[in-house]
Design a protein with these regions (language model features):
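Surface-exposed, polar helix/loop patches in the mature regions of secreted/periplasmic/lumenal proteins
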Residues: 84-136, 140
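Bacterial Sec-dependent N-terminal signal peptides
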Residues: 1-24
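Active-site nucleophile-His-acid catalytic modules used for acyl/amide transfer and hydrolysis
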Residues: 143
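C-terminal/domain-edge helix-coil "capping" segments
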Residues: 20-49, 111-134, 146-212
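Residues in well-ordered beta-strands of folded domains
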Residues: 7, 35, 140
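A structural "domain/chain start" motif
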Residues: 19-108, 210-212
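Compositionally biased, low-complexity repeat tracts
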Residues: 10-12, 26, 70, 134
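Generic surface-pattern signal
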Residues: 6, 70, 74, 83-87, ...
């Protein structure tokens, strides 16, 4: 009986270890869970007209940008960008984070540089409520700035192991905004980032991380 119990324990432990994702899984085919656009650290420069408000950003535009990623998967193609077989959408995680944002102070004259951004992103991931998604490879974009003055959106592309919340890859990217209307214009910066990654950066990251 003791031998049986020990065998069950070993098998369960082995199964748990196998479920955890490693850095190499970022570059392998398979599934990825898209947790959305995390705006909890974001600042905005001149993105609204005179009638716009910071509350509008939190209540209207941030949900609109997240929903667009889901409603137009052919354009915002995470599977093609990151060479994955399937994308599982779980943007409720980012929605819960974004709903806690305080509107005051979001509109600024210039976006400040983040101190120790990788450590900050790691702390954000640790606190995520991923709901029923308990394992697998997670992906989130932590947006830091939408800047009309520079016509750019900046964000940290972040892969993590869902089971342990360990960050596997965190890379800063900047995309050029383009399009008509506030929603499409700033979503254009995300689209530009995806195209950059498809063209060269995913291959560059593979060489950077897997050659160590």
């Amino acid at each position: 009986m003791k031998k049986c119990l020990f065998l069950i324990f070993v098998l369960a432990l082995g199964s748990g270890l196998a479920a955890q994702k490693q850095l190499s899984d970022v570059f392998e085919k398979g599934d990825v869970v898209w947790f959305g656009l995390d705006f909890s650290q974001a600042k905005f420069v001149q993105i609204l007209n005179e009638q716009g408000s910071e509350t509008e950003i939190v209540e209207k535009w941030i949900p609109a940008w997240n929903n667009l990623m889901v409603s137009e998967p052919g354009k915002y193609d995470f599977a093609k960008t990151f060479k994955k077989e399937q994308v599982i959408y779980a943007i409720e995680t980012a929605a819960r984070v974004n709903e806690q944002m305080v509107p005051e102070g979001l509109l600024v004259s210039s976006c400040p540089d983040m101190e120790a951004p990788e450590a900050l992103v790691a702390d954000l991931i640790k606190a995520y409520d991923t709901g029923s998604v308990t394992e697998g490879l997670g992906l989130v974009f932590v947006v830091t700035c939408f800047n009309k003055g520079t016509v750019q959106g900046s964000m940290y592309i972040t892969f993590f192991d869902i089971a342990s919340r360990e960050v596997l890859l965190c890379e800063k990217m900047t995309g050029r905004a383009a399009g008509f209307g506030i929603r499409n214009y700033w979503a254009g910066s995300i689209y530009d980032v995806l195209k950059q990654i498809q063209k060269k950066d995913f291959k560059r990251w593979r060489s950077k991380y897997l050659s160590k």
